[in-house]
Design a protein with these regions (language model features):
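Hydrophobic alpha-helical segments within soluble ligand-binding/sensing domains
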Residues: 76, 131-157, 200-201, 248-252, ...
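Hinge/cleft segment of the Venus flytrap/periplasmic-binding protein
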Residues: 29-31, 161, 165, 169, ...
Length: 314
């Protein structure tokens, strides 16, 4: 339900208000932040994230250099090192692979550059703060939803489609799922659906037709947004196969409303864009930022209304 995100957003609101009370500097002393995403600029989640980040940059009077690597880790690594060379006032980045930023974070800290992670985390790097969901807990919440609602049983094999197998989000979410399913003897199958929209639908449809999975956990937003088209193509009626997973798109929100998806997770994408900038602004002003802001809540047909209203305003 939407209420599960209240605590994290309360902390986030406090950060935002504190940051907004700081008056922007002149053009000559404007702070410069780099924001680096592993996502693609045309992805629905990242469009909303970018809107939030851009709003924060404007409201806080800072210069933000935003880049998207489209899943190319080498390109993101190059962008991070270019940011380090520019000696900015702060860097915010995703961490799509464990250990990807160990050296870079150490170099940034040595240079006195604040580092905030968002969307995907790697606390072992020593980053100063994180904005986003606890992905391992997200996986556990999805699995517990099925168990609590008696939608899976021992011996079932749950379909886990994902865009990028091996990425940190897949690994962490699957760890959370395993913590619930393994003791109960519920099996699961992580399947590479790819990132191409047409390919996702084709691969998922083929799997559903061939395997008749008893339940589905969509580990990413693109696979979650494809559920209706996959089920329609495979001849699966809405509600006959339980589905949970991510819900950061209008498509998935509509799937929840129409019964194709039982419950979906919302990461408050615009807030996830705004808050890293606010945290970097605080750090650049000398304020300590050693805390995380969790942006996550589960919604279903009874609570999807506000999310659909938000999308319909755009």
């Amino acid at each position: 339900m939407l209420g599960t995100g209240k605590r994290g957003l309360t902390a986030a609101a406090a950060v935002m208000m504190s940051a907004l009370l700081s008056s922007p500097g002149s053009a000559a002393d404007k702070k410069v932040f780099y924001l680096l995403s592993h996502g693609g600029p045309s992805d629905a989640f990242w469009i909303d994230w970018n809107a939030g980040a851009t709003k924060a940059c404007d409201q806080l009077g800072v210069t933000c250099k935003i880049s998207f690597s489209g899943g190319d880790m080498a390109a993101q690594k190059e962008a991070f090192n270019s940011a380090l060379a520019a000696k900015p006032d702060g860097i915010a980045t995703t961490s799509a692979q464990p250990g990807l930023w160990t050296k870079e974070v150490a170099a940034a800290k040595s240079a006195g550059i604040p580092i905030v992670f968002f969307n995907t985390d790697d606390p072992a790097t020593g980053r100063q703060a994180y904005v986003g969901a606890d992905l391992k807990e997200a996986g556990a919440i999805w699995a517990r939803y099925f168990v609590d609602h008696k939608m899976v049983k021992k011996g079932d094999k749950v379909f886990l489609p994902v865009e990028v197998p091996g990425a940190s989000y897949q690994q962490l979410e699957t760890e959370g799922i395993a913590s619930v399913f393994d003791p109960l003897g519920v099996k699961y199958d992580v399947v590479d659906a790819g990132t191409d929209p047409a390919g996702i639908i084709s691969k998922m449809t083929d799997y559903v037709v061939a395997n008749h999975p008893p339940a589905v956990i969509a580990l990413g937003d693109s696979v979650a947004a494809s559920i209706k088209r996959v089920f329609d193509g495979a001849g699966v009626k809405a509600g006959s196969v339980p589905v949970v997973g991510w819900g950061n798109s209008k498509d998935t929100a509509e799937e929840v409303k129409s019964g194709y998806v039982n419950a979906a997770a919302w990461q408050f994408p615009s807030a996830q864009g705004f808050m890293p900038v606010a945290l970097l602004s605080l750090a650049a002003s000398g304020e300590p930022i050693g805390y995380d802001i969790h942006t996550f809540s589960l919604y279903d047909a009874s609570s999807v209304g506000p999310i659909l209203n938000l999308y319909n305003k755009k």
